[in-house]
């Protein structure tokens, strides 16, 4: 069953009206082409009006859409010869992180991504895209390998956050995330991070220390989920919509703040409308960024990442 949101209701009603007219025209053999064409033009305008003026909370809804493409959907459209590697060589294979090696535009690369499931059963297997420490250690193993063999690193971010259960804490969740941050800051190879859905807290940042940070048009990247923010600030998770506006976490906000380096255009309505078109835009943007970064020496790549991190946020000292 397709998932639709309240703000899409006018579009759905008009689509249904057009479908009914087309069916009626066919059944009764009546030419209703002028009326149908008029409604089609109105539908195009309505889609542009609604999807071109989405509020932050509406973008959150699209980023979480049950049919939103994940890494496995994009991989065959972005890469050749993707070979997945599993396990952290210490404890287990975390299914909320996927990674391996591939060919991107003729260049060998290492790719690492969060991944959610399709449906309840797979989401439980993948812990709804929330990695445990072994997931981040798997990512670190793959990125260390990329450094050893001088392969660029491409990460894809889509997680509500890191797993926060007792088992995750017992196995060193904070340490695992910190190791990823430390390692990514010091690598000599280009790193491009792309937020393809949710970018939640330290669980996202663990794959987010890059020379270039790109966001899909309807994705978001935040220190906290809007529901959690509302619970803390107003003791009311129902105020998530207000929190979403206050957090300034949309792709457009982050580009203005200098946290994002680019926005990847999505089809009207979201990436789930056409994974092929979204992947095409993604491939073009990543290829341009990679071509630029491959011209830079290792020291400059490290300095670039360090300065990017140090410029996140603002603070002022008061006596």
UniProtKB/Swiss-Prot annotation:
Domain CoA carboxyltransferase C-terminal: 35-292
Compartments in which it is found: Cytoplasm
GO CC, one annotated term: acetyl-CoA carboxylase complex
Any GO BP: fatty acid biosynthetic process
Source organism superkingdom: Bacteria
Pathway recorded for this protein: Lipid metabolism; malonyl-CoA biosynthesis; malonyl-CoA from acetyl-CoA: step 1/1
Major place of residence: cytoplasm
Protein's UniProt keywords contain DNA repair: no
Stored InterPro entries: Acetyl_CoA_COase_a_su (IPR001095), ClpP/crotonase-like_dom_sf (IPR029045), COA_CT_C (IPR011763)
Keywords: ATP-binding, Cytoplasm, Fatty acid biosynthesis, Fatty acid metabolism, Lipid biosynthesis, Lipid metabolism, Nucleotide-binding, Transferase
Subunit structure: Acetyl-CoA carboxylase is a heterohexamer composed of biotin carboxyl carrier protein (AccB), biotin carboxylase (AccC) and two subunits each of ACCase subunit alpha (AccA) and ACCase subunit beta (AccD).
Protein family membership: Belongs to the AccA family.
Record's protein name: Acetyl-coenzyme A carboxylase carboxyl transferase subunit alpha
Gene source species: Desulfitobacterium hafniense (strain Y51)
Name of the gene encoding the protein in the UniProt record: accA
